[in-house]
């Protein structure tokens, strides 16, 4: 933690093709070793695949997928009287988006398709249809929070 006070959060510039900050953040999440050009090519190719297969606007499909992935509740460990409790808490909007993007990219990387643009396109389409590994992760997170609802009074 910085001792000199609050560090201002830098604003992400929207991407040039879709003029969307969410797309720009996804490109940043896809990027490995600073190769933004490669990451944006992968994403735009994935969006082309989505447009071909669904016939819908890829940005709308992506936003629908993100709404289905982003968690509302999560659990946080809290130590009270020598015991660790998993306390359910609401997820802040910024963290919701961050978790959604992180889960989307990580589960897309684990898929079996040949290229990353195909994997990402499939994961986005699955998430838009409320299926897929990223949506399952959200459901598991919500189940965990629901199971530990008894400890909700330990919130801080």
Curated annotation (Swiss-Prot):
InterPro entries: Ribosomal_uS7, Ribosomal_uS7_bac/org-type, Ribosomal_uS7_CS, Ribosomal_uS7_dom, Ribosomal_uS7_dom_sf. One of its GO terms (cellular component) is small ribosomal subunit. CDD domains: uS7_Bacteria. GO terms for biological process: translation. GO terms for molecular function: rRNA binding; structural constituent of ribosome; tRNA binding. Pfam families: Ribosomal_S7 (PF00177). Keywords: Ribonucleoprotein, Ribosomal protein, RNA-binding, rRNA-binding, tRNA-binding. Part of the 30S ribosomal subunit. Contacts proteins S9 and S11. Belongs to the universal ribosomal protein uS7 family. NCBIfam families: rpsG_bact (TIGR01029). One of the primary rRNA binding proteins, it binds directly to 16S rRNA where it nucleates assembly of the head domain of the 30S subunit. Is located at the subunit interface close to the decoding center, probably blocks exit of the E-site tRNA. This is Small ribosomal subunit protein uS7. It comes from Latilactobacillus sakei subsp. sakei (strain 23K). The lineage of its organism: Bacteria, Bacillati, Bacillota, Bacilli, Lactobacillales.
